[in-house]
Curated annotation (Swiss-Prot):
It is found in: Plastid, Chloroplast thylakoid membrane. This is Photosystem I assembly protein Ycf4. Seems to be required for the assembly of the photosystem I complex. The chain crosses the membrane at residues 22-42, 57-77. InterPro entries: PSI_Ycf4_assembly. The keyword Transmembrane applies. Pfam families: Ycf4. Keywords: Chloroplast, Membrane, Photosynthesis, Plastid, Thylakoid, Transmembrane, Transmembrane helix. Belongs to the Ycf4 family. One of its GO terms (cellular component) is chloroplast thylakoid membrane. It is a multi-pass membrane protein. One of its GO terms (biological process) is photosynthesis.
């Protein structure tokens, strides 16, 4: 969802609360929980789940390895759920022509630098740059070239925009900021 008027353009950025992240966090949690239960049932010698009889899996070495994979998977799953809970990477890009300020805001991990804010003058924006990498994994990223800051990505690398959508977005933003477009 974006909001735009004559003087202000606000573009909201979706963070880690995407359907694919929910899907992978659930799959990883359930899979690692299954590994941990099978490893634990082989250690106890009792069937905690009826799918695998505990007599078929000996604790040393299969049970230990499955328990290790289960614990490691639970740690990775908890990391994914934490990023979803904190909505890491979400935020907004605000371009204010009236005040001449560009503000890029993102949420990070909890701590001292939870709020990531970049503010600079609109006159420092030199150009809008479109990077296209063709091949097996096509990647199209929109950058903003800022004097003294370097290039700042405006789109995520996992956003699968068509070439037409990317060109449209770059043209609209360059027109709004009154800067040229560069492509490479």
């Amino acid at each position: 969802m974006n909001w735009r008027s004559e003087h202000i353009w606000i573009e909201f950025i979706t963070g880690s609360r995407k359907t694919s992240n929910f899907f992978w966090a659930c799959i990883l949690f359930l899979g690692s929980l299954g590994f941990l239960v099978v490893g634990t049932s082989s250690y106890l010698g009792r069937n905690l789940i009826s799918v695998f009889p505990s007599q078929q899996i000996s604790f040393f070495p299969q049970g230990i390895v499955m328990s290790f994979y289960g614990i490691a998977g639970l740690f990775i799953s908890s990391y994914l759920w934490s990023t979803i809970l904190w909505n890491v990477g979400s935020g907004y890009d605000r371009f204010d022509r009236k005040e001449g300020i560009v503000c890029i805001f993102r949420w990070g991990f909890p701590g001292k630098n939870r709020r990531i804010v970049l503010r600079f003058l609109m006159s420092d924006v030199q150009s809008i740059r479109v990077e296209v990498k063709e091949g097996l994994y096509t990647r199209r990223v929109l950058y903003m070239e800022v004097r003294g800051q370097g290039t700042i990505p405006l789109t995520r690398t996992d956003e699968n925009l068509t070439p037409r959508e990317m060109e449209q977005k770059a043209a609209e933003l360059a027109y709004f900021l009154r800067v040229p477009i560069e492509g490479f």
